[in-house]
Amino acid sequence: MGMTAPIPSPSARPEVERLRGYSAPLEGRRGLLRLDFNENTIGPSPAVAEALRAFPADQIAVYPEYDGLREAVIANLQASPAGLAYPLSIEQVGLFNGVDAAIHAVIHAYGAPGDTLLTTSPTFGYYAPCAGMQGMVVEAVPHVLPGFRFPLQQIRDALERRPRVLMLCNPNNPTGTRLSVEHVLELAASAPDTLVVVDELYEAFTGDSVLPTVDFGLHSNLLVLRSLAKTSGLAGLRIGFAFGHADVVDRVCRVTGPYDVNSLAVTAAFAALSDQAYTDHYVA
C-alpha cells in the first residue's frame, strides 16, 4: 500500500495567518514575584476565600447567573470617595472574562479590515494583536522623551484622521504615564466618530479615573475598562468590567458568549466588592 501525502490543515482568515500570537511568560515562574505582571502581592480579601470555600458544589454543574453583580459594581463606585457625578444604569455595565476579553470584544465589535487603531508606544501588548485579528492598522504614537510623557498634541493630530478606535492605558502600562481626566474628556469630545477606550486597570494607584465625572450621555463615544485583578487580587479568576453609554456596552457585549464569566469569579467579585476596606488598605 503506497504512502499518501499529508493533507494540509484548512487555512484561517488571512488576518489570522499573518498574526503573531500573544503569549505571556508564565511557565516556570510560579511562586516568584512576577513584577512584570503587577500581580497583587498579598492575595484577595479573606472574605473572598471564605466565599469560595462555601461555594455549593452543585452550583458547579449549572450555568452562572449574574443577578445583582452589576448593581453591586455600581454601588461600590457610588460609595467610593470620588463617587459618581452621573448615575449609572445596569445597562451601562458590561461583564467580561477579564479586561483582556473586554479589549478583544471592543476590537471585534468596532474594528474592520483597514480601520485604524490609535494608541501610544510602549503600552499594553494585547492591543495590537487584537487589532491584527480584525485586520486593523495600528498607529502607535511614541511617548515623549525624556520621561515617557504622554504625546498629547500628536494624538490630537492623529484623531483628525478619524481612527476607528483610540486605546488609552491610563495610567499607562508599562511606563506609568498619566493623562488627566480633562485631557481624556477633551480627546473624546474632539473625535465623536472614534471610540475612545480608557483602560483603567491601574487607576486605583493614581486616582486618575474618568468614571467619577464623565457623563456618558454627553461623551457617548467613551468606554472605560476596569478589573478586580490588580487591586482585589482576583487575577486568576478573570473578571473585568466595561462602563459606557448603554448602546456601546450593548454592542460590545453582543460579540461575547452568554456565560463567559464563571460562577466562581462572580462569587469572588461579590465578596471583594463587599470588603472595599481590604482593597483600599492594599492600594495605600
Protein language model features and the residues they cover:
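The start of beta-strands in P-loop NTPase/AAA+ ATPase cores
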Residues: G31-L33, R164-V165, T194-L195, N221
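PLP-dependent aminotransferase class I/II
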Residues: N221-A284
